[in-house]
A protein has these predicted regions:
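C-terminal motif of bacterial Sec signal peptides marking the signal peptidase cleavage site
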Residues: 15-18
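Bacterial signal peptide processing site
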Residues: 20-22
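An active-site-proximal "capping" alpha-helix that borders the catalytic cofactor pocket
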Residues: 60, 262, 473-490
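Long, well-structured alpha-helical subdomains associated
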Residues: 81, 485-589
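Post-HEXXH active-site segment of zinc metalloproteases
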Residues: 455-478
Length: 673
């Protein structure tokens, strides 16, 4: 499970929550410079940033090799994510990139500029659907203009892959709306287009689920296909679906295993390799157990088919890779959270029968990202808690990480204009300026370390993807948010040395959460649209529920001033109680598998938008030029060789342009044809 930055760096105050051929021209900027240019460029609704890798130059040569091999393994699977997102993505990308590189005509007119913008949006989203809203991207040029470009560059793109750029077909990558066939209405490539919601449920009702009490993540690494009327799975593995890319992943993982920091780490990599070779989900669980217990060493990684947000049914994992270097100082400061995990569980407002009696193995680290790929790039999370399998988490624990250098990049690229526009008063602004960054880090930490690790299912109740279905993801993210919100106003945080004033810290966190959940996140959707993305939905249902339940006591007051709308919290302690009540209810829903209650909560509070308020927010936001979404180019790791072909050093080079990195990736890591 991951906590994403779902807004631009300017909105971060609202929540926190090789030697290569054909490489692009690069700057001489390195990760050790004191002056660093965080912003690459901006287009459409996207801002592209850079991040540094603190601590990389202090690693030993074997540690640098380990990072480099894992970096290569991650990028080797990049195109898997593109194909998972939509069946025509790779063909469309290849055609658009060929035009981009070879067109020699007029590049100053509006049509070409619109083409460039569209291609950059496709790159950013790993396909033709928006990375966040899941809506199909709308090109700012005509079919006739694209045909002209294709002809002038001798590029082939015809039939459905051409038509789908412009027509209404496959308009949603993921559609979790109530009342529609969520599978048939979703363009994501986890299921053949002819497969329906009921067919998926029927197939997985009888599929292998693992040993009793230790269920595997059924369907995680497969595509469901229909051949001659019969439904079956194609497995992602060597020799199977995506085999050519997976073989490259395996090649680099084998090299990484050879320079592992310790025996446990090496054994863990061996299990990951075995999983990629076989596609066996029991092996995946063995790997996850070994990985969660691999806590020594400075280097760690996430690699595999992991998060299920892109599957309307919650079975299929999207490919991702994140390479991490431990931030020792920050990890030491935040270790007290994992050390006190049982205290948080025992004192939480959950029903006693839903509390874990023995919270095991919760580890928390702040890390610096060295590289990302797949579902984690260019749009990246800021916090991750894994593994996702509930029984493994309960018996073996979990790892929670905060991506420190990613958060720092957002903070260093930011400004305060939107805060001053949407905050209710100067006190709110002052709290944000004083405690905003700390509140961000602590909400991320509490969400990941305590939130996702808390609570337990009732005996005999199925996994949330089976019981809560299309509401499982937003319910889990909201539940983890509520854990964080409840404890952010607790004196325990001050006792643990995490803040100098828990009350002001809590007020800051509550202000920013309500401000974002009820107001500022609306800048990310079009007027008239419902909220659909799981994290946005969860922030609205949490905020709307506590607003409504506290209305009679004016816990939160809606303020209209000079034609603008604000929300002012009058009673922070009562608000904390409401967060606690809602937390107890969301845990009950999860523990009991209460689909109807989840549906009522999400549909009743999280989806529909006040259209008058939405129009107002969009108008107020229009004066700001910064984009509502941000993502990153990755630093490029360059292996320096001696005459014998051995790696003697690995250096960091920052890419000059977003387009340059995307073209380079396609040329060097295009293993799916």
């Amino acid at each position: 499970m991951k906590l994403r930055v779902l807004f631009s760096y300017l909105l971060i105050g609202a929540l926190i929550w090789s030697c290569k051929e054909n490489a692009p021209e690069k700057s001489a900027t390195s990760s050790v410079e004191t002056s660093f240019d965080y912003v690459v460029e901006q287009f459409a609704d996207i801002q592209i940033l850079r991040y540094q890798i603190p601590g990389f130059n202090e690693l030993s040569i074997d540690q640098k090799k380990l990072v480099y091999y894992l970096y290569q393994a991650g990028l080797a699977g990049r195109d898997i994510m593109w194909d998972q997102n939509y069946r025509h993505n790779l063909q469309i990308r290849a055609a658009l990139e060929n035009v981009y590189e070879n067109f020699s005509g007029d590049k100053e007119n509006e049509n070409w500029k619109a083409f460039e913008t569209y291609l950059k949006r496709v790159w950013f989203s790993n396909g033709i659907h928006h990375h966040y809203s899941n809506d199909k991207l709308v090109p700012g040029f005509s079919p006739e203009y694209l045909t002209e470009l294709l002809n002038e560059t001798n590029t082939e793109l015809s039939g459905e892959p051409f038509d789908v750029i412009f027509n209404e077909q496959d308009s949603k990558k993921v559609n979790k709306k109530k009342g529609v066939d969520n599978v048939a209405a979703s363009a994501v490539n986890f299921y053949d287009p002819s497969i329906t919601d009921k067919e998926v449920e029927a197939f997985y009702a009888t599929a292998y689920k693992g040993p009793e009490g230790k269920p595997v993540e059924t369907g995680l690494n497969t595509k469901l296909v229909k051949r001659n009327g019969k439904i079956s799975e194609e497995i992602y593995k060597s020799g199977g679906l995506y085999g050519s890319a997976i073989d490259e992943i395996i090649k680099w993982l084998e090299l990484a295993k050879g320079v592992a920091e310790n025996e446990q780490q090496g054994n863990t990599l061996a299990l990951l390799i075995e999983y990629y070779k076989t596609g066996n989900l029991d092996t995946w669980d063995e790997y996850a157990i070994s990985w969660v217990n691999s806590k020594e060493g400075d280097i760690d990684w996430i690699n595999g088919f992991i998060e299920v947000y892109n599957d309307p049914k919650g079975y299929k994992g999207s490919y991702e890779s994140i390479i991490q270097i431990k931030d020792f100082e920050m990890s030491k400061q935040m270790a007290v959270l994992s050390e006190n995990a049982q205290w948080f569980e025992d004192t939480s407002p959950l029903m006693e029968e839903h509390k874990k009696k023995n919270v095991v193995g919760v580890s928390y680290k702040t890390v610096n990202v060295a590289a990302e790929a797949g579902d984690a790039s260019p749009s990246t999370p800021i916090g991750v808690n894994l593994p996702n399998n509930n029984w493994i988490r309960q018996e073996h624990g979990s790892k929670s990480v905060s991506l420190g250098n990613i958060i720092d990049s957002y903070n260093n690229a930011g400004g305060s204009g939107r805060l001053k526009e949407f905050a209710n008063d100067t006190e709110e602004i002052a709290f944000e300026e004083k405690y905003g960054k700390t509140a961000s880090k602590l909400l991320t930490a509490l969400h990941e370390v305590v939130g996702h690790a808390s609570g337990q299912l009732n005996e005999g109740v199925g996994q949330p993807k089976e019981t809560l279905k299309n509401y499982a993801s937003t319910m889990e993210e909201g539940r983890a948010d509520l854990v964080g919100l409840y404890f952010l106003m607790d004196p325990k945080l001050q006792e643990l040395g995490l803040t100098d004033n828990y009350e002001e810290l809590g007020k800051t966190a509550y202000d920013r959460y309500i401000r974002n959940g009820l107001v500022t996140q609306l800048v990310r959707i079009n007027l008239g649209d419902d909220i659909e993305e799981d994290h946005m939905v969860n922030r609205q249902w949490v905020s709307s529920w506590v607003f409504e339940k506290g209305m009679s006591d004016k816990v939160i007051e809606k303020v209209e001033r000079d034609g603008n709308t604000y929300y002012n919290i009058n009673d922070y302690k009562k608000l904390r109680e409401l967060f606690g009540e809602l937390l107890q209810e969301t845990q009950r829903i999860k523990s009991e598998g209460d689909f109807k209650a989840a549906q009522d909560l999400v549909e009743g509070y999280g989806v529909k938008v006040d259209q008058k308020l939405h129009a107002e927010v969009l108008e107020r936001n229009s004066v700001f030029k910064s984009a509502p979404y941000s993502g990153f180019v990755n630093p490029e790791l360059v292996a320096e060789m001696n005459d014998a072909g051995e790696i003697v050093n690995v250096s960091i080079v920052q890419p000059e342009t977003f387009a340059g990195q995307m073209i380079s990736y396609s040329k060097n890591y295009g293993f799916l044809k």
